[in-house]
């Protein structure tokens, strides 16, 4: 988000968490906050010392009669200093054709340049010739060791619970480590702190439900989302005893709590738990799943210094019988 003073032609840009620092001379100023796709917000202030100024932007849409597209020289067409970075809009992902109608975040990445799928019915992907195990996948900063359900047919990410997805194909920042090919940084929704809302869907293989709302308006909010497949229910309806005793299903749960304690401190607690269960009569069984928890504390020391403290837990378990 761009935050600036029009009169002084001086401004700054917020970071990923919405924090910014802007130094202005004492006096009366008009401060503007602006971002593409949102309504511009202006506030009048009388600056006498250090102060905190928060903005809340509302989404906007504009109907255009005509759009003219023109290009610029390659050396002038620089919109970001981040190279080899792609961002996915979850709204666009939901519009893409998907296998059996199930929205899949990971498979949608294979539509981007430099990324290829490892094959149909598989959830892995290759980035610029690298192997699938060279991709670091994060969910609210917690590493995910197995990002698929049903042996790779679907990803573990419930699109209703995802806020945004960022993919680093090269020039990976130093804060990420442990992989050679790419980093997929998935962030969950923080919950609506104004009103309660629900989103859900019924698909061919699974159903899902997401609830969000304020715990305390303007201060704390929550988001909880669940999903379960029901292939095992259909198998039980078959008359063949070799099939109706088989088990094949998955389920997952996403949660997040956001609490703005005061102007200087914010807490975020998020979690994920998912499980796959597969069994062939009494002959063979295979269960696996992920569990992650992230606790982040954002603290502003002064107008120019802030810090993020994170406590991360990630676990992958499986059993073979």
Which residue stretches match the model-derived regions?
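Transmembrane beta-barrel wall of Gram-negative outer-membrane proteins
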Residues: 203-228, 241-277, 286-313
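Short strand-turn segments of transmembrane beta-barrel domains in outer membranes
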Residues: 152-155, 163-173, 182-213, 221-228, ...
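Membrane-embedded beta-strand positions in outer-membrane beta-barrel channels/transporters
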Residues: 54, 66, 106, 124, ...
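Periplasm-facing N-terminal accessory domains of Gram-negative outer-membrane beta-barrel systems
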Residues: 1-66, 72
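Transmembrane beta-barrel architecture of outer-membrane proteins
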Residues: 104, 110, 122, 152, ...
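Outer-membrane beta-barrel and related beta-rich outer-membrane complex signature
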Residues: 236-238, 268, 276-283, 319-321
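Periplasmic N-terminal accessory/gating domains of Gram-negative outer-membrane beta-barrel systems
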Residues: 39, 51, 70-173, 183, ...
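Structural signature of outer-membrane beta-barrel domains
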Residues: 74, 132, 142-144, 189, ...
């Amino acid at each position: 988000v761009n935050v600036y003073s029009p009169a002084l032609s001086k401004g700054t840009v917020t970071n990923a968490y919405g924090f910014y620092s802007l130094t202005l001379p004492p006096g009366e100023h008009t401060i503007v906050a602006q971002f593409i796709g949102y309504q511009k917000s202006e506030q009048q202030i009388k600056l006498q010392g250090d102060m905190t100024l928060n903005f809340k932007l509302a989404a906007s849409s504009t109907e255009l009669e005509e759009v003219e597209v023109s290009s610029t020289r390659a050396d002038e067409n620089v919109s970001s200093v981040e190279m080899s970075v792609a961002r996915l809009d979850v709204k666009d992902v939901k519009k893409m054709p998907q296998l059996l109608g199930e929205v899949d975040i990971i498979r949608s990445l294979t539509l981007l340049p430099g990324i290829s799928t490892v094959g149909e019915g598989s959830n892995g992907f290759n980035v610029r010739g690298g192997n699938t195990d060279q991709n670091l996948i994060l969910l609210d900063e917690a590493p995910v060791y197995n990002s698929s359900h049903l042996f790779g047919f679907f990803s573990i990410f419930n699109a209703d619970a995802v806020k945004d997805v960022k993919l680093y194909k090269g020039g990976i920042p130093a804060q990420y480590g442990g992989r050679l090919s790419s980093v997929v940084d998935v962030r969950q929704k923080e919950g609506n702190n104004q009103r309660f809302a629900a989103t859900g869907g019924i698909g061919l293989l699974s159903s899902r439900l997401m609830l969000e709302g304020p715990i305390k308006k303007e201060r704390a909010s929550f988001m909880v989302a669940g999903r379960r497949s029901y292939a095992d229910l259909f198998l039980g309806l078959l008359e063949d005893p070799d099939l109706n005793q088989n088990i094949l299903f998955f389920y997952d749960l996403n949660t997040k709590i956001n609490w703005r304690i005061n102007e200087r401190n914010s807490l975020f607690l998020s979690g994920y738990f998912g499980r796959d269960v597969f069994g062939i009569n009494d002959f063979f069984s295979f269960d696996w799943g992920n569990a992650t928890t992230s606790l982040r504390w954002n603290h502003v020391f002064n107008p120019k210094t802030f810090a993020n403290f994170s406590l991360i837990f990630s676990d992958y378990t499986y059993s073979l019988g």
